[in-house]
Amino acid sequence: MAITHNTHVDTSDTFTPPTFSLQEQRALLRTLRQQMVAHYRPIIFQGAGPIRVMARMVAELEQQCREHAICEEVIQSEIVNRTIGDVNLRRVTECEGIPGGAGDYRMLADELGVALPGEQLHGYVTTGETYLWLRDQMQECERALLQQRIDVRIYDIFGIGNPILRGWLAGDMQRWGLPVIGEQVYLGLGAMDSADKVLRSMSFFLREQNAANPGILFPSPGFNVPEWQARSYGYHLHHFHTDARHTFKLTALQLDEVLRQAPDIRLFYLTVTNNPTTFAYTAGELNALYKVLRSYWEAGRDIYILADLAYIGTAQPEEDLARMKTFAAPDVLRHTIFVSSFSKSHTLTGERFGYVTIGDARLAPTLLPGWTNSTASLPGEWQLRYMAYYRLVQSRPWLVEKLRALYRLRRTRLAAQLQKINQEQPLFERIHPGDDATVYNWCQLRPGEDAFSLFEKTGIAGVPGSGFGYTDDYIRFSIGVIPVPEVE
């Protein structure tokens, strides 16, 4: 693995005049950008993670620009970091309609309790009311827990979180049509931690059954962190390369073929709404996959679904409901473990609110070691804040719709921006529309182009397809951090 955090591009021979025009600053920045691309391109081939390489390249270029006294206006117009799939409400500038109205997205940081009282956010001064309200709710929640003799300040023996919050989250799953109870819900520090605990527990459980390392199926492109986790726990990794003809989704015929060819597969990582492609399985497509799996279940081969729900809640509600209801079939639910998170659906990436729902109540106790032997006990303040945020969203459901509207606005604007760029200098083979979900845009580049050449020519940094187990003629752009201007 290449170490990139100490890399530095030597630009000492690039002369910076004491004072120089905006045009000269842009020319200098583009020269620096070209040098940075030449330096970082080989690092990808040395095995470093593409997402981190691209993000590091952008950060170092910004640093170099400031060292050369290039003004912020030029930096922001010539360097657009769309690599990391984060969401930063403090940087939201979009306002549709009248200030303070339903389309004033600048208010989201205040409305979701991210902003402190008195922050100046792009012409809007925050009240901090929700910020303070959340702290009052934390106190109320702690009192409610203590009344039931639950003290989050001491060890939770199983490390799965307090039963009141777990019951609330089970209620959310019930609203999707899934008959689960709080005992089937375990808390985790975000989706990644939750997936890690499941993979650790399932590896032990499956090896105890067969005395062999189990196989796991990962369709690509897809989020690759669970792959690293699975590899570390001894799984045999099986990949299937999906294609644009099927909107990058695994078909029933393809699933059947893979399962027949790899009899060791016992776990299937299914991203219901996909990162990076932004396409989501329809209810019909999911049922077709279950039909294939059912034939194996009935033959005595248990294959479990690890269903990643990280982006459920970012699409149209009625479509998400239809998707989730398909899991209610008793045999499907019994073979499914769900991983959920508030990170993208509620823009709370830094809070790390995640949880696991185990469809089979009999399997749930078997997975306890993944929690008990890792975190030992979940943080008390974190649990209280988790509960406060749950109450916030339940009491103000319009917040989630407003977030969906912001995501939709940005995805639409970015697609229009990329189309305009493509008219001026053909770089994209196709700009995929997606399924009106996630915080990304997914594009195919023209032959001869890649993420580095695109950055050199446009200043827009994305993540190459290899970051998702795919080919580098594809690229993912994030819309969660940097606002997207309207195309004129």
Explain the meaning of each model-derived region.
Residues 6-31, 35, 41-190:
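N-terminal small-domain helix-loop-helix segment of the aminotransferase-like
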Residues 21-36, 73, 109-111, 133-145, ...:
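Conserved core segment of the aminotransferase class I/II
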Residues 55-66, 419, 426-427, 437-484:
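Conserved C-terminal alpha-helix-loop-beta "cap" of PLP-dependent enzymes
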Residues 80-81, 222, 387, 400-415, ...:
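Conserved glycine-rich beta-strand-loop-beta hairpin in the small C-terminal domain of fold type I
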Residues 109-302, 312-331, 337, 483:
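Conserved core of the PLP fold type I
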Residues 306:
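Generic enzyme active-site microenvironment
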